[in-house]
């Protein structure tokens, strides 16, 4: 069955809309994958263990903290700057405090500057991997374990980096279901062990 002019145009337009919707849907996971693989935009890498090689060359890591508008916590790095050898495992802490009278959940987003160093900044353990819930008046120390990959000295764009800034921004998120039930005093359906 042959399509006439208007029918052919409608089929082409529907095809374009479906194609654009598919590309829009696929762009978010593709961009996330691209940033993790290339370190684009200061996205860091995740490592299972520390580096096998430690160089004599040192690098400074600055720690920065901010909060999204409306996030009621106090949030700051315990140590503002740390100098370590490239490849050496570092341990830094951030402090968070919930001054409110209610539990507050948060999720940290992170970035590394300059962007060229993001690919070489490896986190072994980080509070940013999981959502955090602070009870009213609770103060916690949150660790991040990391190292700078020795391969940074081979990269023509990153080898002259002497200082890396690790920035975290905390965003308020909805309380997990078990915490929400405890907050309202309704224990029906609340888990006995909260993660």
From Swiss-Prot:
Q: Where are the transmembrane segments?
A: 10-30
User: What's any one GO cellular component for it?
Assistant: plasma membrane
Q: Name its cellular compartments.
A: Cell inner membrane
* InterPro entries linked to this entry: CtaG/Cox11_dom_sf, Cyt_c_oxidase_assmbl_CtaG
A GO term for molecular function = copper ion binding
Instruction: Look up and give the membrane topology term.
Output: Single-pass type II membrane protein
Principal place of residence: membrane
UniProt keywords (A-Z) are: Cell inner membrane, Cell membrane, Copper, Membrane, Signal-anchor, Transmembrane, Transmembrane helix
Q: Does the keyword Transmembrane apply?
A: yes
Instruction: List, alphabetically, the SUPFAM superfamilies matched.
Output: Ctag/Cox11 (SSF110111)
Record Gene3D superfamilies: Ctag/Cox11
Family that this chain belongs to: Belongs to the COX11/CtaG family.
Among PANTHER family, the record links this protein to: CYTOCHROME C OXIDASE ASSEMBLY PROTEIN COX11, MITOCHONDRIAL-RELATED, CYTOCHROME C OXIDASE ASSEMBLY PROTEIN COX11-RELATED
Cited NCBIfam families: PRK05089.1 (NF003465)
Q: What name does UniProt use for this protein?
A: Cytochrome c oxidase assembly protein CtaG
- Native organism: Ruegeria sp. (strain TM1040)
